Structures are given as C-alpha cells and as structure tokens.
Amino acid sequence: MLPTVVGKGNRMLPFIRRKAEPKPSGDWWTGAFTQEERATIEGVFAPLGGGTAESLARSTNPNSLGTLAEYLKKEHLRHLGYKLLDRADTLVNENVPVLDLHFYFAVRGGFYYRWRDHDPFALDEAVTSFQRQIGLGANVARFFREDKNWGFIPAHAGYRQLRIIEEKRGNWTLARALCEQAKAEGWADDWDHHIGRIDKKLAAMKT
C-alpha cells in the first residue's frame, strides 16, 4: 500500500512558519521597508506591461506579492523577497481564487528552494509551499481541464520539485506516491518514466 501523500484531499494546509507574523495593519509597505529598500524594489521591477512595485506590494492577493518577489532572486536582495512572502502569507485565505493560490505556492516554493543551501529555514519553507500547492491539486487540475482559456493541464511545480526532494532524501516510496498521485490528477510530466525508474531503485534496494 502506498503512503498517503501530504496535502492530498486538503484545500488548505497550515503553514510551518519561521516566526509569528502580525496581522496586516496600517501602511505595511512603508512600515516594512525603508525608503532605500522601496527604491531598490522599484528599481528591479520591470514588468512588460508597466506598473509599479508598490501597486503589487499593496495588493491583498498573495499571488501579486509572489510575482513581485520573483524580481528579488539575487542573493543580496533575497531578504526583501522574504519580507514580501511573509506579508503574502498573512493574506492567504479561502476567499483567494484557487488558481492564484496555486501559482503563489509555486512561486513561494521556488523562491525558498533557490536558497536552500544558504538559509537554514529555506528548504523546510519550500517543502511546505509545495505541499500546500499539492493540497490544491485536484481542484486546480479540474479548473485547468474545464476552463476554455486553458483546456489542458500543465506541469505542476509542487509535484515535480517535491519528488526531486524526496528522492534526494532517499524517500523513494514517497517519491513514487507523489508520481502516482500527480498522474492520477492529470498533471503533465513523464510520470510513467519516473515511476519505472523509482521501481528499479526500490527493487535494487531489496536485493
């Protein structure tokens, strides 16, 4: 029997937070960042359609702040990205459109995973993000399948990256279960190839 994959069947999963965060209040944009930091964020923000970093930072949609954090991936700017993601976390709730949560958790996971070898909390935060994205998987897959603007189910960052993480940890049975679950939900990837490769690894471990 395959193990239960974390996140399966849950719409929302609790965050494992690095620290207690206050509820959003007041002018968070000017309170969280110095004038110099705000100028830095505006300076690196260069969307194709124009706009300001401040407009995204003041949004109540976590995906907007996640989008802004993606512009702060350089090592010397990552602390600013962490602040944006901390703020975004306080905005996650069941009123946020499920597709926005799906993309936010992918961005959040990717951002933290990038710094897994630099910051001691980063890998755990990345795993938590991918688990939360997986928890929304079945509902989001249904949306992609039925929405006329999509009509297909793309790849899933959470399933893909968490599979890699669990393989690196030697958790082959869990990695296989992730593949099976992602395949069942219809997410694009060569899941049969991954399952076959993992099966060979598991068989070799028994000999």
Segments and roles (model prediction):
Residues T128-G135, W172-A188:
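TPR/TPR-like (Sel1-like) alpha-helical repeat modules
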Residues E75, W115-R116, P120, R169, ...:
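Structural motif corresponding to the intra-repeat A-B loop/turn of tetratricopeptide repeats
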